[in-house]
Design a protein with these regions (language model features):
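Ligand-binding pocket scaffold of soluble enzyme catalytic domains
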Residues: 59-60
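Glycine/small-residue-rich loop that forms an oxyanion/phosphate-binding "nest" at active or ligand-binding sites
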Residues: 63
Length: 81
């Protein structure tokens, strides 16, 4: 059952995501912000929760998309000048 919590003023119910999905989200966020230690820990936990290699790589691609779009848009802007 999800437990009501608060983090930096945001109210949420911890446990709303299944454990594997939560660990994949943690992993993807850690990868996106360059937190290698956190990424390794959450990758191990995701695998313990049954994450497949395909699910792990899909999470990596999701982590890359915002940065890739930003790089592309900035490049287009600069090249067009």
């Amino acid at each position: 059952m999800a437990e009501q919590k608060e983090f930096f003023g945001v109210k949420y119910k911890e446990g709303s995501l299944d454990p594997k999905t939560a660990q994949l989200v943690f992993f993807a966020v850690c990868i996106a912000i360059g937190h290698a230690g956190g990424a390794k820990r959450h990758l191990d936990k995701a695998r313990e929760c049954g994450a497949t290699e395909d699910e792990i790589w899909e999470a990596v691609v999701y982590a890359m998309r915002p940065a890739a779009a930003k790089v592309r848009d900035l490049a287009k802007e600069i090249i067009a000048q």
